Structure formats: C-alpha cells, structure tokens
Amino acid sequence: MLNILLTLVFSLIGLVIGYAVISARLKKAKETAELTLLNAEQDAVNARSKAEMDAEHIKKTAERESKAYKKELLIEAKEEARKYREEIEKEFKSERQELKQMDARLTERAASLDRKDENLSSKEQLLDSKEQSLSDKSRHIDERELQVKQLEVKKAEELEKIASLSQEQARGIILSETEKNLAHDIANRIKEAEREIKDRTDKTAKDLLAQAMQRLAGDYVAEQTITTVHLPDDSMKGRIIGREGRNIRTLESLTGIDIIIDDTPEVVVLSGFDPIRREIARMTLEALIQDGRIHPARIEELVEKNRLEMDNRIREYGEAAAFEIGAPNLHPDLIKLMGRLQFRTSYGQNVLRHSVEVGKLAGLLASELGENVDLARRAGFLHDIGKAIDREVEGSHVEIGTEFARKYKENPVVINTIASHHGDVEAQSVIAVLVAAADALSSARPGARNESMENYIKRLRDLEEIATSFDGVQNSYALQAGREIRIMVQPEKLSDDDVTILAHKVREKIENNLDYPGNIKVTVIRELRAIDYAK
C-alpha cells in the first residue's frame, strides 16, 4: 500500500516537474518564435529598404546612362552635320571651279571663233590675190603670144634678107644666132647649178637645226599677270583692308600692284604686269599674315625689306642661269642684270629661260660646225641682256645690251652678236649668225610666245611711261588692268595746284598717244611727311 502511495506521489511529482519543464520549454519556444518573427519582420524591412535603395540606384544609373547616350548621339549628330557641311562646301567649291573652267573654255572658244573669222578673212584676201595673179598671168600669156607672132614676122623678114646675102654674110649671121643660143643655155645651166647648191645648203642647214633641236630638251610655262595668296581664314581679309582701307591702300601705293579681295574663300589675288613688283607684294603680304601686325608703318618696313631681299634673289637667279649655261667669269653686274630677266617676259615668254635656251641651241649648232662652243653659249646667253634695263634707259634693248657688253669688256664676238641678232648691224662671225638662228628658233616654236599678252603688257608699260615723263613724278603704277594710272609725285617739287594741272596734262597726253578701250582714271597723289625724333 505504501509502495503504491509512494509510486503515486512520485508520479505526481514527475508530472508536476514534467509540466513545469514542458511549460518552460513552451515559453522558451514561444519567445524564440516571437524573436524569430521580429527578426523576420526586421529583415523584411531591411530588404524593402535595400530594394528601394537598389531601385533608386538603378534609376539614377539609368538616367545617367540615358544622358550619356543622349550626349553621344548629339556628338555623333554634330559630327555627321559637320561632315555633311564639309561635303556640301567641297561640292560647292568643285562646282564653282567647274563654272570657272567652263567660263575659261567659253572665253577660249570665243577667241577661237575670232581667230577662225580672221583666218577666213585672210583666206578670202588670199583668194582675191590669187584671182588677181591668174588675171595677170593670163594677160602676160596674151602679151607673150603677141610677142611670138611679132617674132615670127621678124624671122620671116630676116629669112627674106638672108636669101639675098652672100655665103660669108649668112655664116656670120648663123654664128651670131648660135652664140646667142649657147649663151642662153649657159645661163640656164648656171641658174640650175645655183638652185641645186641652194637646195643642198638649205637641206644641210635644216639637218643642223634639227639635230640641235633634238639634243635640246627645254621646257616652258607661260607667265601670268596674277599671283594668288592663301589666307588662314576669311577674317584676315578685314585686317588686310584695315580701317577705312588704309592698309590695302598703303600696300597698293608702295608696290604698284592691284590687290583683289572678293568672295573667294581664304584667297587674295595680286594683279599686276610687273613680276618684280608682284613678287614683292606677295612676299610682303605673306610676311604680314605670318607676323600678325598689319598697319601702314609695318607695311612700309616689310616692303623695303623685301625689296632688298628681291635684289639678293635676282642675283641668285643670275648665278644659277650662268652656271647652267656654263658662262664663267661673268662680271657681277652682268649676272645681276641677267637675274632681272627672270622677272621679264617677251610676248609671254620668260626672257631668262629664253636666253638660256638660245645659249644652249647656239652651243649645239656651234658643235655641229666645229666653232667655239663656249663662246657661242656665252653670246647666246647674253644676247638679250639689254631687256633688263630698257625700261629705265633710252634706246632699244640691242643698243643698251651692246653698250653694257662693251663697258664690261666682253669678247668682241659677243658684242657683235648682241648688236647684230636683230639685223641692225652686219654679223661679223659665224657665231653671231648661229645665235640669231637660235634666237629665231626659241622665239618662233609653237607655244613659246603669246602676242596678245605682250600687247596688253606693252599698253600698261606705255601708260606708266607717259606718267613718268613729266617732271616731279616719283613713281607711277598702272592698276585695274590699265583702267587707272596712279601717280606719286615729289611734294617738294610740286604744289597742290600743280597736282591738278599734272593730272590734266597726263590725261591729254594719254588721249593723244594711246589707243585704249573705255576710260582711264588718272590719280595723282602728293604726300608730305615731317619726321623728327625725341631724344
């Protein structure tokens, strides 16, 4: 019984303890579950917050990438627009160039039509001349027939006389007639021999010229009257013109060159018939563009500097040509004069290159004939030296060249060659004849010369010479293709009233002495400067 009670007591105690343990575990499990729930809720909040932050970051990243993409698209669009604009400008330039070429072709075609018209006129004159010649020949034949009939009558009369003559008298008449016939035959044979000798001489001369021309490889580029200067950008045009045009007027008055500024992009055109003045203007303008300081004082400084530089270049041209032709021991003054011919043209042909070509041809001809080759080359090289100064000294270029060759003690053969190459005096040597032939070859070959260009340049040169012929004139420049003559006078010699009178006199002399199209503007400039230095 006691055992049962103890068992029950222990069982109850165990139940109580088990309940207590289970209750404690359940409580702990509940707390753990609540803590887990709280942690889960916190994690959910954190996850939501992180998701919102990630979403915001993704949104900002997308916006940034979108802006970058838009910017890249904008840059690409601008680049495409720039390329398209460049292509359009290139096509525009090409079309404009084609239009210029087309205009040049039309001008050339018009000139060709004019030439054809002149040829037709000359052919018509030739036909008229031939018709007149045929008429003259017909009349001459009629006259000859009349003479033959008269001779027949005369012979018949003579035969009648002979019939009544003695044997000795008849023999004398026959011998006299025979002598006349023989004299006629001898004269015909002499003429035939002379013609054969002339034909043979002409053939030999042509063979010599052909061999000399085949051995000479010359080239030539026609001279022009304009020079193009390229600009870094179009804004430079305004700086070249200057305020109220002071810069461009100063440059034109100092160089005597017409400066043309038009709508052509990044280009300025220098126009003038004097190549030396045009080259000085080009050098000055390029130096001004490179330097950046463009004002009248700087322009005057650079023009003077480039004049000195041009003197050095002229001497270098002369030395190079003398070396090319093989003419040693030339006087320095003669070398400088020959260098000036680089900037002189004759009917569009560069005179220095023409002189070198004549020297080479004369040397080749001399070698074929066994003459002094070096002397022939030297004489041919110097034959046109008078053209270097014929604008400044009175007389033809032949007279001036002869005088300078004599002054610098050139060989008498060279002096005679210069004097005789245009037939003014008699040639005294074979070399003089060879140089004259070489000069004719170099001048007359197709494409060497352009007569219309030479006539244009001569008209401008005559215009300047008329202006400088008056007392007190310092310089004169023909501008605007001869439509304006600008005259610089010495202020100490001429007053303001004298300037007006001078312009009137120049106008009258131009009207009396020159033939020209349109009008010519005469501008006389009198500039007085007073310079002092503060110390």
Curated annotation (Swiss-Prot):
<keyword id="KW-1003">Cell membrane</keyword>
<dbReference type="Pfam" id="PF12072">
    <property type="entry name" value="RNase_Y_N"/>
</dbReference>
<keyword id="KW-0540">Nuclease</keyword>
<dbReference type="GO" id="GO:0005886">
    <property type="term" value="C:plasma membrane"/>
</dbReference>
<dbReference type="InterPro" id="IPR006674">
    <property type="entry name" value="HD_domain"/>
</dbReference>
<feature type="transmembrane region" description="Helical">
    <location>
        <begin position="4"/>
        <end position="24"/>
    </location>
</feature>
<dbReference type="InterPro" id="IPR004087">
    <property type="entry name" value="KH_dom"/>
</dbReference>
<dbReference type="InterPro" id="IPR022711">
    <property type="entry name" value="RNase_Y_N"/>
</dbReference>
<dbReference type="InterPro" id="IPR004088">
    <property type="entry name" value="KH_dom_type_1"/>
</dbReference>
<feature type="domain" description="KH">
    <location>
        <begin position="225"/>
        <end position="285"/>
    </location>
</feature>
<feature type="domain" description="HD">
    <location>
        <begin position="351"/>
        <end position="444"/>
    </location>
</feature>
<dbReference type="InterPro" id="IPR006675">
    <property type="entry name" value="HDIG_dom"/>
</dbReference>
<keyword id="KW-0812">Transmembrane</keyword>
<feature type="region of interest" description="Disordered">
    <location>
        <begin position="110"/>
        <end position="141"/>
    </location>
</feature>
<comment type="similarity">
    <text>Belongs to the RNase Y family.</text>
</comment>
<dbReference type="GO" id="GO:0004521">
    <property type="term" value="F:RNA endonuclease activity"/>
</dbReference>
<protein>
    <recommendedName>
        <fullName>Ribonuclease Y</fullName>
        <ecNumber>3.1.-.-</ecNumber>
    </recommendedName>
</protein>
<dbReference type="Pfam" id="PF00013">
    <property type="entry name" value="KH_1"/>
</dbReference>
<dbReference type="Pfam" id="PF01966">
    <property type="entry name" value="HD"/>
</dbReference>
<dbReference type="InterPro" id="IPR017705">
    <property type="entry name" value="Ribonuclease_Y"/>
</dbReference>
<dbReference type="InterPro" id="IPR036612">
    <property type="entry name" value="KH_dom_type_1_sf"/>
</dbReference>
<keyword id="KW-0472">Membrane</keyword>
<keyword id="KW-0694">RNA-binding</keyword>
<dbReference type="InterPro" id="IPR003607">
    <property type="entry name" value="HD/PDEase_dom"/>
</dbReference>
<dbReference type="GO" id="GO:0006402">
    <property type="term" value="P:mRNA catabolic process"/>
</dbReference>
<dbReference type="GO" id="GO:0003723">
    <property type="term" value="F:RNA binding"/>
</dbReference>
<keyword id="KW-0255">Endonuclease</keyword>
<keyword id="KW-0378">Hydrolase</keyword>
<comment type="function">
    <text>Endoribonuclease that initiates mRNA decay.</text>
</comment>
<keyword id="KW-1133">Transmembrane helix</keyword>
